[in-house]
A protein has these predicted regions:
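Anion-binding alpha/beta catalytic cores of soluble intermediary-metabolism enzymes, centered on
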Residues: 1-210, 215-281
Length: 281
């Protein structure tokens, strides 16, 4: 994949990360030539079959030869199959989830969005896992006690809106010490979660733990998350970085349509998380 190779090239030039390239060597060389990439300083492992290439690549990470795993030209289904491989994959026993990190102009803090790409309809248990996975990423980038906003259309609990009930339950679990390393406050609407000015006009805002300063936006389902994500990327043109979380090592899972800059950001995020995991595991 040309965008992936170009991202790898830029990441190396910026001293973010080096790479071991696994795949059809002839194709890699052909693509590298088209983007003026010098391969003389890269290790290339020649594997013609894409499925076997993915399996080989993920084994390098699970064996500790490499620090993170990045999706190349293989389709997402094949890539995830290698991540979940029982022999050489990166399973930990924890549920996997996807996190996107945005640096939004006008918002003082980084925003961590989850899950926008992996879990379609998260249960309460899934949401606990998503929070735990995303909190670990926050800790890795230097946010010791991130604020988590379980999002809904309203800020009050309404039995007819199960999302609000689950958000309140997550808040209670945090208060009882069942969810740690963060502050959970929900249900919250998006404006109350990330916009201090809007939050000040909401009834009861002064009693909330989050008033426009949420770090983690926990979406009720993949539809809400994906729509917000794509609006931010394609309308507001906000660049981000993405990781699959809950694995033994960082997994860079980006879309083929993502720009080189998004892929470089994802590698940078993965490098920071990999270093954190090494120091804390």
């Amino acid at each position: 994949d040309a965008h992936v190779l170009e991202a790898v090239k830029v990441a190396k030039e910026r001293n973010i990360a080096d790479a071991i390239l696994v795949g059809d060597k002839e194709q890699i060389e052909e693509i590298a030539k088209s983007i003026d990439m010098d391969l003389s300083t890269y290790e290339i492992i020649d594997v013609k079959d894409m499925t076997e290439a993915a399996r080989k690549a993920v084994s390098l990470v699970s064996e500790g030869v490499a620090d993170m795993y990045m999706k190349g030209a293989i389709d997402t289904k094949g890539f995830l199959k290698s991540v979940l491989d029982k022999e050489v994959g990166l399973r930990t026993g924890k549920p996997l989830s996807h996190v996107c990190v945005f640096d939004v102009e006008g918002v003082d803090q980084l925003l961590f969005l989850s899950d926008v790409a992996f879990i379609p309809y998260p249960t309460l248990e899934d949401k606990v896992s998503i929070i735990n996975n995303t909190v670990e990423i926050c800790h890795a980038v230097g946010i010791p006690n991130p604020k988590v906003a379980p999002l809904a259309a309203v800020e009050v609990v309404n039995p007819k809106m199960p999302v609000t009930v689950e958000a309140a339950e997550l808040t209670k679990m945090n208060e009882e010490g069942k969810i740690t390393g963060c502050i959970v406050d929900g249900p919250l609407s998006l404006d109350l979660a990330i916009c201090p000015e809007a939050a000040q006009h909401k009834p009861g805002a002064s009693e909330r733990k989050i008033v426009g300063d949420a770090d983690i936006l926990l979406f009720p389902d993949i539809h809400a998350g994906n729509l917000v994500y794509k609006a931010m990327v394609h309308t507001a043109k906000i660049v981000n970085g993405n990781l699959l979380t809950g694995t033994k090592a960082p997994v860079v899972l980006t879309s083929r349509s993502d720009s080189v800059e998004v892929k470089v950001n994802s590698l940078a995020l993965g490098a920071v998380v990999a270093d954190f995991m090494k120091k804390n595991n």
